[in-house]
Amino acid sequence: MPAPRPARSAGAPLERKGGAAVNTRSPAVRPTGTTQVLDHPLAASLLTSLRDASTPPPLFRLLAKRLALLLCMEATRSVPTAQTEVRTPLTVTRGVHLAKPLVAVPVLRAGLGMLEAVTELFPEVTVGYVGLERDHATFEPSLYYSKLPPLEDRAVLLLDPMPATGASASAACRSLEQAGADDITLLSVVSAPEGIAKLHEQHPSVRVVTASVDEGLDSHAYIVPGLGGFGDRLFGTL
């Protein structure tokens, strides 16, 4: 798999790159924190297929996993390493190993579609879970499940494929911070600028790595153009 090029910051106006739909207008609320948009032709191609309404659930799951692999590689670019020595068949040479344990926390249920990618790249990763439900009238989330490992001195990867209003992502981050997390990176497939702005306002230290910042939200708080309900398409519960 080709290594991803450095991601772009979402602090400046975004352009359409490699077929990926990103924000090209001035939204009412623009992200102001640390947000990186993955800039890779494979990511753009995978995202295009995920957006396609005719993509069936089995293929959707495969595409989501592949895109999550790229997102995870970018999200862990700055994980600290430590020097070590390794013996090759010919000699001894220097290398590195990860110096900070990783924890993956998918937001149920949609985040499960990104989890396998993380566990394949990092088999030693510890996994926690956060369950949130959104009230479709107020769009506000409620926490119904939380099972978290120790989070202090660990790099936490929060898996939330589609932060829309930012309420669920903020609630998840709040739960993680209350459990001791101080190094959180949110991985998402598509994001709304309103949601990212709210997340950075309430949790300015959280970094976001996404494949696209879309145009915004419609009157039902759905991301436009988006890709529909990620969890429903992932599990075939349309």
Predicted regions and their residues:
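PRPP-associated nucleotide enzymes
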Residues: 2-238
